[in-house]
């Protein structure tokens, strides 16, 4: 068979599905078939083509399996119509066609131009006709899909898919609208009006068409991640939306109460309805509001209100809209100022400022937190999916490759006898036989062996190192058409021979050598240091030439710039060509920077050519010219940290591309919808042309983009409302469009930008570190200059990256630089280390020693004066006093009057200033006396903070000295006094920490600043090219040039011809312009803050030419410049900036947690556990009081109150402006009713709880306050109205009632205490506030300093209405200045305030300016002042809020199965039910019930079977007190510790010791007592609840065994003899052995799944026996399962034996609150074994007895037993001994959450036990055998402890069993409670003696020996050593097997007599011989421990 035949057979006939041989997965040939058969080919996946076909078949098969068998009830899958529909719908071109149709439809919708009054034109009419075509196409698509997939019933039906449903609705609505249009037209209508055909407005239905672009989302996969993460985030966002809604509702109702009807008074001319002002604003006829100052004007009502009556608080809905507008921080100051005009300055600012802080800064930043959390989670998922996919593909390729090779070798083996086979193949087959599998690359190289040059070139591109790197498709092409290749090879070979001949000539050789030398020299030159700096210099010159352009520049400068540009272009071209030649094209192109360079140079050449030819508009040219500026980024190449940043920015760009696409779709949809709704409607105001309209598609896009950025979106909304008839019912609905657009666009999509930025930066940090390492390794290998070939793929990349680099010397320098940088970065990372050190140092300042060296050259170190000063300045009173004086001096600065410089107040403050300065001077002199001035280490001036102090004081002193001379100098010095508050930083540690944080942040943000500034500079240069000198205009819009704008002109305000005004024509420039680079950067900075950019945009659109006026909409396409700038700078770079700040703060915060071994979450949880106090729950004793208490605490009562609050809210929200008197009366009556009901609630609660307990709860105090306030409110209203209801009005009232009105609203806040989710949110809010005090202090300081500077610099500017410095907004008083700064911080038109503060403004008439200085107020300093303040606030300070919020609210998106501090409140609440008195202790019996009531991850959850809960408790190690109780903190701490795995590995004592150290290190002030309580010290032998619960397992197990046996679950044949019964019992004991060990070594999770399965069966079984299971222990919590698994180092048993199945036993019905006694006996001397196991022994002295109650087995009633705690007189020798307890009690102890302790072997110790617990004894046994247990205290630990599981007591040495017992030592490992390896079963041979050899033990029966032997065989030798434990186990076996003890003994004797016993295993039986000596050895071994 020839090679070509092999090739042909690669695609054999498809074999049947159940074909023989390996399937397509293997790609192997099935054995040696006969020659010529088809089977010799590869199977289904033999070739890639074949594989894709196979995959396609497979997916089709899967899809068809999912399809509904019938569509539309009649079409089956075999129906030809349906089959053809399916094939059409799944045909790829069909999808493409539909997408193209959607796109075309969008274009058609965009081209449509809406006209006013529903007018139309021919183009629109034609577009309407085209719409029918689209509708037909979409209808056909829908019908086809419905036929193919079915309509709705089947899961894969058409409508079940969300996108399809959307399509379906759009199509149905479209058809519906067409039907309506066919209705009878009205007579006289134009034939094609766009409006209301058929008498019905179809426009609303047409609006649905605009949703069609959404279908593009389903067609673009990269959009899915973004859309998915947004969808996923919607669930937590819903929580936040509810919270925002709640805030809005509360503020709206408060607004109704305070501001109802306030906006309707303004100034009118007396006797007419004409408004007195051009721009009217509210006024107050009385009180402290604005009064009408003009003559003949009065303040009266009936004014609609500002914004045409939209902005007001007249009813609930208007109030909500106004509040929402304020939360968005757009136009909120206008509303505030109107309210101040209407009411005065007292109340409104509190309302609005608090609204902005809560609503905007806090609640809305939560959106960001949630989105960024969800986004990073979604991206991780996508990444994981991608990685998995890659891995699968790689494995698939490798398998395919193996298949090919096997197939080739096997085919050749078959065909070796064929003479046509090439020698290559023969050798190949030999290699195949020899076991060497050739790689694919080798095969191809052999095939191409003759083509030397060809293989030569492939070597450089294909890596020969690994076959996996070659894609499978290559291999396919090589094996597909070998015949053709042979022909090609022939022709190629002849060409090669010719080429070789030519190359061997001498000339060619010389030429090649010269060429090689020249290239090497070029390469060295290009990489040299000199070249690098030369290029940088050229870049700098290039930048300088472009930046020097400005408006009105002289001619010579223009010419110089042109020449310079051409010269520089030539130089850059030369550089590019040199690199191309020296490095070779492939290497040159490999570097991104080189490609970029090439693009810039080619752009430059193109631009120059076009200019010379004159073929292009200058506009485009100037833009191209600016592309050169991108060269600036060349600087970044050798600046490692900067290039890393640029790389991560480019990465972010990739992920942002899909978001931009989504954003674009979103904008298009809303623009089209806006055109449908508002097209041609914004023409209601004839006098003023609106710019932000929806009249054309481009204009609509701009308007939507403007709303998206949030700038003046409210103004557009007002226009929209006015277009629909103003603030009345239908018109107000329009606001829904704008609100949805704003929320989805601004809050969700734009926050996703920030989320992506934060996410990329966070993940980028890790990436850059890796890159650094890689760069270093690649740069370590210098390139070999004489080789052109690059050996491997990776090196090629490295070389590409370095191809621009320097010579070797340069590389070394670079490495050094990088190392330095890394060190710097490490320092930065350890910044918090420095911070911590500083924090440590600050307290020590009190005792800083006097430094060596003399002060002032005369005072030595021992000088008494110096010592006295030292004592004085370190005295705490002195420090506090200085702090007080700093605060007082700051207050005096704020109190100065900036206008009247010589006022009495200023004189007084001047004297204070003298005093303060003197005090500070004395302080500095004292400090200098102590520390010396500056010459030696530790001297005063060596500290930065001290230098700051010195500066502040010396400035004050100098300003006193030069009163008279230069005024400006004094002013500057006076301004510098503001730095005084900064001295407080040195005194307050927390503040110092925050300040250092800010500095670290500023340092790390440096790089981002540089990149942003470079980009900003670039855009500014482009702006200068485009707009220089084009922003001039004449005040008369009719004139367009400077020459024309002379004289004056008339204007008619509001179009009123009767009132003409004369104005002068002026030629003015725009405030923000692009005349030079600095102005351009300033203008662009304001654009990037989103303030006032639409005005600038429309100026740019209208810009015509230099020195010419604007032309309306001249260049609409120019808007692209602004949009690109906003997206790159404002959306992207600013968000990266913010993200950087957030990440830096987060990193700073986490650095604290780096040095203490606990992460942040662990630390917070542990802190909570240590600081938490139990809640007091008062339960009254008095029966009547108890009834009231029960009522008040009932669910029904709670729901009733909830309903009342809601009804009250509705009643409050019903108020409105101009309500009728009866309505008023009804409202007052309702208010009284509600107040009465709430008063009754308060009285009832006070009766139930007594005042002391009632007021202990904060919510109750709040309630009481509200009730009292409401009562006062009613009383005051009555007094004011003289007893008449319904007549209250603020103006007539004698007492101000607005304050008391608030109490009505505050009832709403009570709702917050009701919802669980909201409660958690609130709790986290309060936590955030706790994290914020120092941040808030820093913000307050910045505000203070800026406010005082503002007062000094801009306080003299006159207040003029109509300007930005006016009565509401000025610097004349300190509070006003702070409010103005707060306004700037929210970004509300800050740039206009800046312009109003520049020089040339009118001065305040009261200030003392000289003649002619009237217009000299203001200062150029305003630019620096406002920009620095805005940057500090908007970027740093506000982001501190964001950082804190994102930190604290990460739980909203975190995995809920991870324990966090927000879970721990539940523990307190449920604990209080068990410990109502808040004593902090509960019985250990209640612990299991308690933990089963708490949901995971903290508790076990009610689904956790009781037995598993007990096992978990065994592992938790909760310390048990001597009275049988556990403490609150210890239990909570143990839960946290176990759940978060804090120090749970290794030796318990060692782990405890380490944890104690960690806790002491972090919480230095923790009380020793508390620490000992939660982590017992090693010298105390603590008994834990876990150890106490251990023996519960034995009793529970045997009882279950007996019950199953009775029910016949363990097999039908009953044992015939006592011997076999005994064997069964012993076997069961052996089965239990591993379980006891597991329980004690924390292997509680392994069997859970099996337990659950059997547990259900057991629970059903139990339900029959027990009518009321879990009566009280299950709370109505939502069901959840404990999901997190704990990895355990123990091997798992393959299958649990039947008898081991768990589940709650019969007696689980016991209520959890029942209290059982513990019996305690005091002994004398505590003792402890070095093995660390607790010893349980019984003292032989007589004991006092305590009787328990007796009852029946399986008893279900709750038994109340007396709580008792014996007095332990440790000094005396008294002791207690209980009588045996009842059987039922024992069972209750077992199932009612208590069990027996673990046991240890007796020890040769003379001491007596300290106290003993004797319990759990069975009733009805032959002898009273209590389970003994001794608790020991107070002995130090033994000398050495072995490592083991933390839950297990450590032990000394390893337990080595006797040889016969243990087959291999390694199989059991460390034995009792140690590390277990190997199988858990050990099959051993034992020989049991009749009596124990040790004479000290009592004589025991054969049964005892057998039980001991079984225990020992199971590794429980220490238990076997305790005769009492053996007796208990024997008793349990006897009971379970229905034997008496005598029968058991005799059966055991029979077994021993036979000298055989089978091993107690279910699977097999081994004969064992028992020997006395062997057992003696075993016991001796146990003793040796």
UniProtKB/Swiss-Prot annotation:
Location of region: Dihydropyridine binding: 1065-1155, 1402-1468
Disordered: region residues: 1-56, 455-490, 766-834, 1643-1729, 1746-1778
Membrane topology: Multi-pass membrane protein
IV repeats by residue range: 1182-1449
Region annotation (Binding to the beta subunit) ranges: 395-412
Tissues of expression: Expressed in the inner and outer nuclear layers and the genglion cell layer of the retina.
Claim: NAD is one of the keywords in the record: no
Extent of Polar residues compositional bias: 1675-1687, 1713-1724
Keywords attached to this entry: Calcium, Calcium channel, Calcium transport, Disulfide bond, Glycoprotein, Ion channel, Ion transport, Membrane, Metal-binding, Repeat, Sensory transduction, Transmembrane, Transmembrane helix, Transport, Vision, Voltage-gated channel
Pfam families, A to Z: Ca_chan_IQ, CAC1F_C, GPHH, Ion_trans
Biased composition annotated in UniProt, kind: Basic and acidic residues: 1-11, 768-787, 1767-1776
I repeat copies, ranges: 79-375
Residues holding Ca(2+): 330, 711, 1091
Region spans: Phenylalkylamine binding: 1414-1457
GO cellular component: membrane; neuronal cell body; plasma membrane; voltage-gated calcium channel complex
Known catalytic reactions: Ca(2+)(in) = Ca(2+)(out)
Annotated compartments: Membrane
Biased amino acid composition, Acidic residues: 810-830, 1644-1665
GO molecular function: metal ion binding; voltage-gated calcium channel activity
Membrane topology, Extracellular segments: 112-129, 181-201, 260-347, 550-564, 611-620, 680-733, 896-911, 963-968, 1028-1117, 1215-1229, 1279-1295, 1355-1421
Domain notes: Each of the four internal repeats contains five hydrophobic transmembrane segments (S1, S2, S3, S5, S6) and one positively charged transmembrane segment (S4). S4 segments probably represent the voltage-sensor and are characterized by a series of positively charged amino acids at every third position.
Protein family membership: Belongs to the calcium channel alpha-1 subunit (TC 1.A.1.11) family. CACNA1F subfamily.
Oligomer status and interactors: Voltage-dependent calcium channels are multisubunit complexes, consisting of alpha-1, alpha-2, beta and delta subunits in a 1:1:1:1 ratio. The channel activity is directed by the pore-forming and voltage-sensitive alpha-1 subunit. In many cases, this subunit is sufficient to generate voltage-sensitive calcium channel activity. The auxiliary subunits beta and alpha-2/delta linked by a disulfide bridge regulate the channel activity. Interacts (via IQ domain) with CABP4; in a calcium independent manner.
Protein name: Voltage-dependent L-type calcium channel subunit alpha-1F
Native species: Mus musculus (Mouse)
Gene name in the database record: Cacna1f
């Amino acid at each position: 068979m020839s090679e070509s035949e092999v090739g042909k057979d690669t695609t054999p006939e498809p074999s049947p599905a159940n074909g023989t041989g390996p399937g397509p997965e293997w790609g192997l040939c099935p054995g040696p078939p006969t020659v010529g058969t088809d089977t010799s080919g590869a199977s289904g996946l033999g070739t890639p083509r074949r594989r894709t076909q196979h995959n396609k078949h497979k997916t089709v098969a899967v899809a068809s399996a999912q399809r509904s068998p019938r569509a539309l009830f009649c079409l089956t899958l075999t129906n030809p119509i349906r089959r053809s529909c399916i094939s059409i719908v799944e045909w790829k071109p069909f999808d493409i066609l539909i997408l193209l149709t959607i796109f075309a439809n969008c274009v058609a919708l965009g081209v449509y131009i809406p006209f006013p009054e529903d007018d139309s034109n021919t183009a629109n009419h034609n577009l309407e006709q085209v719409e029918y075509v689209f509708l037909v196409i979409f209808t056909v698509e829908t019908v086809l899909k419905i036929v193919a997939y079915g309509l709705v019933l089947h899961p894969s039906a058409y409508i079940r898919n969300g996108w399809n449903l959307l399509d379906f609705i759009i199509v149905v609505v479209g058809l519906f609208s067409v039907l309506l249009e066919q209705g009878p037209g009205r007579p006289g209508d134009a034939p094609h009006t766009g409006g209301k055909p058929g008498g019905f407005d179809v426009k609303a239905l047409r609006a649905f068409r605009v949703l069609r672009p959404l279908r593009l989302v389903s067609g673009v996969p990269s959009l899915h991640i973004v859309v998915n993460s947004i969808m996923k985030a919607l669930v937590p966002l819903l929580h936040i939306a509810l919270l925002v809604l709640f805030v809005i509702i509360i503020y709206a109702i408060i607004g109704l109460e305070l501001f109802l009807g306030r906006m309707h008074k303004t100034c009118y001319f007396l006797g007419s309805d004409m408004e007195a002002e051009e721009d009217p604003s509210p006024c107050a006829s009385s009180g402290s509001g604005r009064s009408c100052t003009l003559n003949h004007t009065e303040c009266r009502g009936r004014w609609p209100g500002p914004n045409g009556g939209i902005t007001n608080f007249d009813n609930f809905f208007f109030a909500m809209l106004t509040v929402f507008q304020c939360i968005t921080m757009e136009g909120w100051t206008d509303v505030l100022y109107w309210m101040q005009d209407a009411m005065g300055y007292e109340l409104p600012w509190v309302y609005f400022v608090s609204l902005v802080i809560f609503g905007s800064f806090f609640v809305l930043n939560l959106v960001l937190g949630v989105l960024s959390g969800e986004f990073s989670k979604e991206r991780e998922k996508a990444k994981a999916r991608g990685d998995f996919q890659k891995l699968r593909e790689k494995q698939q390729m490798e398998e395919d490759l193996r298949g090919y090779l096997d197939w080739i070798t096997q085919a050749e083996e078959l065909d070796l006898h064929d003479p046509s086979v090439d020698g290559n193949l023969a050798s190949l087959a030999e290699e195949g036989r020899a076991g060497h599998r050739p790689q694919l690359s080798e095969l191809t190289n052999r095939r191409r062996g003759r083509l030397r040059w060809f293989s030569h070139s492939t070597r450089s591109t294909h890596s020969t190192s690994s076959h996996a790197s070659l894609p499978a498709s290559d291999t396919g092409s090589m094996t597909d058409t070998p015949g053709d290749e042979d022909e090609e090879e022939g022709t190629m070979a002849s060409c090669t021979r010719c080429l070789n001949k030519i190359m061997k000539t001498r000339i060619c050789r010389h030429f090649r050598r010269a060429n090689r030398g020249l290239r090497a020299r070029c390469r060295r030159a290009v990489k040299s240091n000199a070249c690098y700096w030369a290029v940088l210099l050229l870049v700098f010159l290039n930048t300088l030439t472009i930046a020097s352009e400005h408006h009105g520049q002289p001619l010579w400068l223009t010419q110089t710039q042109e020449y310079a540009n051409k010269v520089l272009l030539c130089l850059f071209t030369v550089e590019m060509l040199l690199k191309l030649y020296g490095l070779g094209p492939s290497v040159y192109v490999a570097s991104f920077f080189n490609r970029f360079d090439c693009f810039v140079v080619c752009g430059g050449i193109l631009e120059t050519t076009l200019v010379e030819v004159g073929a292009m508009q200058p506009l485009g040219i100037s833009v191209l010219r600016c592309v050169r500026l991108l060269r600036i980024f060349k600087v970044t190449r050798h600046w490692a940290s900067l290039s890393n940043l640029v790389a991560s920015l480019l990465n972010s760009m990739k992920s942002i591309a899909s978001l931009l696409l989504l954003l674009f779709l979103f904008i298009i949809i809303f623009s089209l919808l806006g055109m449908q709704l508002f097209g041609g409607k914004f023409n209601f105001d004839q006098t003023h042309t609106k710019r932000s309209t929806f009249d054309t598609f481009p204009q609509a896009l701009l308007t939507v983009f403007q709303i998206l950025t949030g700038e003046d979106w409210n103004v557009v909304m007002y226009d929209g409302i006015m277009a629909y008839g103003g603030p009345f019912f239908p018109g107000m609905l329009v606001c829904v469009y704008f609100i949805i657009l704003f929320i989805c666009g601004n809050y969700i999509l734009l926050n996703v930008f920030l989320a992506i930025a934060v996410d990329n930066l966070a993940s980028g940090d890790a990436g850059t570190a890796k890159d650094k390492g890689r760069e270093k390794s690649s740069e370590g290998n210098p390139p070999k200059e004489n080789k052109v070939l690059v050996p491997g793929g990776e090196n090629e990349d490295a070389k590409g990256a370095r191809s621009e680099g320097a010579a070797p010397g340069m590389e070394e320098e670079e490495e050094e630089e990088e190392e330095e940088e890394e060190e710097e970065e490490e320092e930065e990372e350890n910044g918090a280390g420095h911070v911590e050190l500083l924090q440590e140092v600050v307290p020590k300042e009190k005792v800083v020693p006097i430094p060596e060296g003399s002060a002032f050259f005369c005072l030595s170190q021992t000088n008494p004066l110096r010592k006295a000063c030292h004592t004085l300045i370190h005295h705490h009173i002195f420090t506090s006093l200085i702090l007080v004086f700093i605060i007082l001096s700051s207050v005096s600065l704020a109190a100065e009057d900036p206008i009247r410089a010589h006022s009495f107040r200023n004189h007084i403050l001047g004297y204070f200033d003298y005093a303060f300065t003197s005090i500070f001077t004395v302080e500095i002199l004292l400090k200098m006396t102590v520390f010396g001035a500056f010459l030696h280490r530790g001297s005063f001036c060596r500290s930065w903070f001290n230098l700051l102090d010195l500066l502040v004081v010396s400035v004050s002193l100098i300003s006193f000295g030069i009163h008279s001379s230069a005024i400006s100098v004094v002013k500057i010095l006076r301004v510098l006094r503001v730095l005084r508050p900064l001295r407080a930083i040195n005194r307050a540690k927390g503040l110092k920490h925050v300040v250092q944080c800010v500095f670290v942040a500023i340092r790390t943000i440096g790089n981002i600043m540089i990149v942003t500034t470079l980009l900003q500079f670039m855009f500014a240069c482009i702006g200068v090219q485009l707009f220089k000198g084009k922003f001039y205009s004449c005040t008369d819009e009719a004139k367009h040039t400077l020459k024309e704008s002379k004289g004056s002109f008339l204007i008619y305000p509001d179009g009123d011809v009767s009132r003409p005004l004369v104005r002068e024509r002026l030629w003015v420039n725009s405030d923000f312009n692009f005349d030079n680079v600095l102005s351009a950067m300033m203008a662009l900075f304001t654009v990037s803050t989103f303030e006032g950019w639409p005005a600038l945009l429309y100026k740019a659109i209208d810009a015509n030419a230099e020195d010419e006026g604007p032309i309306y909409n001249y260049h609409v396409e120019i808007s692209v410049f602004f949009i690109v700038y906003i997206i790159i700078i404002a959306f992207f770079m600013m968000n990266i900036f913010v993200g950087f700040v957030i990440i830096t703060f987060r990193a700073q915060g986490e650095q604290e947690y780096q040095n203490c071994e606990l992460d942040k979450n662990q630390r917070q949880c542990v802190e909570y556990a240590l600081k938490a106090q139990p809640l007091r729950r008062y339960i009254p004793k008095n029966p009547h009081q108890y009834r009231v208490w029960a009522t008040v605490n009932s669910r029904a009562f709670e729901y009733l109150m909830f309903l009342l609050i809601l009804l009250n809210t509705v009643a409050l929200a019903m108020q409105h402006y101009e309500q009728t008197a009866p309505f008023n009366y009804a409202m007052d009556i309702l208010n009284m009713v509600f107040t009465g009901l709430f008063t009754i609630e308060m009285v009832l609660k006070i009766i139930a709880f007594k005042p002391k307990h009632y007021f202990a709860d904060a919510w109750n105090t709040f309630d009481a306050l509200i009730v009292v306030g409401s009562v006062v409110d009613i009383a005051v209203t009555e007094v004011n109205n003289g007893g008449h209801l319904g007549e209250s009005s603020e103006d007539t009232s004698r007492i101000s009632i607005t304050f008391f009105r608030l109490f009505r609203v505050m009832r709403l806040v009570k709702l917050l205490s009701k919802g669980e989710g909201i409660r958690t949110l609130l709790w986290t809010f309060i936590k955030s506030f706790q994290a914020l005090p120092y941040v808030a202090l820093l913000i307050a300081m910045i505000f203070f300093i800026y406010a005082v500077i503002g007062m000094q610099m801009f306080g003299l500017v006159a207040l003029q209405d109509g300007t930005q410095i006016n009565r509401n907004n000025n610097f004349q008083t300190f509070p006003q200045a702070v409010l103005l700064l707060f306004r700037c911080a929210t970004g509300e038109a800050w740039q206009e305030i800046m312009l109003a503060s520049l020089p040339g403004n009118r001065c305040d008439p009261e200030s003392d300016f000289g003649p002619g200085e009237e217009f000299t107020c203001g200062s150029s300093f305003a630019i620096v002042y406002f920009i620095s303040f805005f940057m500090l606030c908007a970027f740093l300070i506000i982001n501190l809020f964001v950082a804190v919020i994102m930190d604290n609210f990460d739980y909203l998106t975190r995995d809920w199965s991870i324990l966090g501090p927000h879970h721990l409140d539940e523990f307190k609440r449920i604990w209080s039910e068990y410990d109502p008195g808040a004593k902090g202790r509960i019985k250990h019996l209640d612990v299991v019930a308690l933990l089963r009531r708490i949901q995971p991850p903290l508790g076990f959850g009610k689904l956790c079977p009781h037995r598993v809960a007990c096992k978990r408790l065994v592992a938790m190690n909760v310390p048990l007190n001597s009275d049988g109780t556990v403490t609150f903190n210890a239990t909570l701490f143990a839960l946290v510790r176990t759940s978060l795995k804090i120090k749970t590995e290794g030796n318990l004592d060692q782990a405890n010791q380490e944890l104690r150290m960690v806790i002491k290190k972090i919480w230095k002030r923790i009380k020793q007592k508390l620490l000992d309580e939660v982590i017992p010290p090693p010298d105390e032998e603590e008994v834990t609840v876990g150890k106490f619960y251990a023996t519960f397992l034995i009793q529970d197990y045997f009882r279950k065994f007996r019950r199953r046996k009775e029910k016949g679950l363990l097999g039908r044949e009953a044992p015939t003899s006592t011997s076999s019964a005994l064997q069964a019992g012993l076997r069961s004991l052996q089965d239990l052995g591993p379980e006891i060990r597991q329980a004690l070594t924390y292997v509680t999770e392994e069997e859970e799944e099996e337990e659950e399965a059997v547990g259900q069966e057991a629970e059903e079984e139990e339900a029959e026996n027990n009518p009321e299971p879990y009566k009280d222990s299950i709370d109505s919590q939502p069901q959840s399962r404990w999901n997190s698994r704990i990895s355990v180092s123990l091997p798992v048993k393959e299958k649990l034996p039947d008898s081991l199945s768990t589940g709650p036993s019969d007696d689980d019905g016991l209520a959890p609150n029942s209290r059982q006694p513990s019996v305690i006996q005091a002994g004398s001397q505590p003792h402890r074994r070095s093995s660390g196991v607790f010893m349980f022994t019984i003292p032989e002295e007589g004991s006092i007895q305590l009787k328990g109650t007796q009852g029946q087995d399986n008893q279900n009633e709750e038994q109340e037993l007396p709580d008792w705690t014996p007095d332990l007189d440790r000094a005396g020798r008294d002791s207690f001994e209980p009588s045996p307890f009842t059987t039922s009690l024992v069972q209750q102890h077992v199932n009612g959450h208590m069990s027996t302790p673990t046991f240890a072997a007796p020890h040769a110790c003379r001491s007596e036990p300290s106290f003993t617990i004797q319990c759990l004894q069975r009733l009805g046994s032959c002898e009273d055998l209590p389970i003994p247990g001794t608790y020991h205290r107070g002995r130090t630990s033994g000398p050495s402890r072995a490592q083991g599981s933390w839950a297990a007591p450590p032990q000394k040495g390893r337990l080595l069993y006797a040889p016969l017992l243990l087959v291999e030592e390694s199989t059991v490992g460390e034995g009792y409670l140690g590390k277990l390896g190997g199988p858990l079963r050990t099959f051993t041979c034992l020989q049991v003696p009749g009596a124990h050899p040790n004479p000290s033990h009592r004589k025991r029966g054969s049964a005892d020996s057998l039980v001991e032997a079984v225990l020992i065989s199971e590794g429980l030798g220490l238990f076997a050593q305790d005769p009492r434990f053996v007796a208990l186990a024997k008793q349990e076996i006897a009971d379970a097997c229905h034997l008496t003890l005598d029968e058991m003994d005799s059966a055991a004797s029979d077994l021993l007599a036979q000298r055989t016993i089978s091993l107690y295993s279910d699977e097999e039986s081994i004969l064992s011989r028992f020997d006395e000596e062997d057992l003696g050895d075993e016991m001796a071994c146990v003793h040796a421990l």
